[in-house]
Amino acid sequence: MFEEMILEKVRKEAERIAEEQGLEIFDVQYRRESRGWILRIIIDNPMGYVSVRDCELFSREMERFLDREDLIEHSYTLEVSSPGLDRPLRGPRDYVRFTGKLAKIVTKDGKTFIGRIESFVDGTITISDGKKKYEINIDDVKRANLEVEF
């Protein structure tokens, strides 16, 4: 079966399982890497952070589906994980959800801002580095991610 078809079927089932478990799908990848084929499913918890238990329960259900459907003809590794502490910020929902968190935003013109997300209103992200506040239009963001705090 072609990789795109596998990915589509896996994503559909992954979204169903995630919804049942109160989770969301952040990303689904199916690719050949140096150690062989990897089916990587990244789950997210909209109410907080993803626990090891979340990954374990999701993985069990996904394995049942994959074994039953037998979509993948060759050997592969199933990886289930969270987006990580330095997760990418992908859109308005993430900026609202992570208000108060430390983030790094790189704009399309190459400027980099590191600070706490103060708000997201009408397409504008307000971020503060403790000394100054910056307002960044979401359309100007090239990439953004949370920063790990120690």
From Swiss-Prot:
SUPFAM superfamilies, sorted: YhbC-like, C-terminal domain, YhbC-like, N-terminal domain
UniProt feature coiled coil, ranges: none
Subcellular location: Cytoplasm
Top-rank lineage group of the source organism: Bacteria
Alphabetized UniProt keyword annotations: Cytoplasm, Ribosome biogenesis
Cellular component terms per the entry's GO annotation: cytosol
One protein family per Pfam: RimP_N
InterPro entries: Ribosome_maturation_RimP, RimP_C, RimP_C_sf, RimP_N, RimP_N_sf
Keyword flag Cytoplasm: yes
Biological processes per GO annotation: ribosomal small subunit assembly; translation
UniProt family annotation: Belongs to the RimP family.
Purpose of the protein: Required for maturation of 30S ribosomal subunits.
Official protein name in the record: Ribosome maturation factor RimP
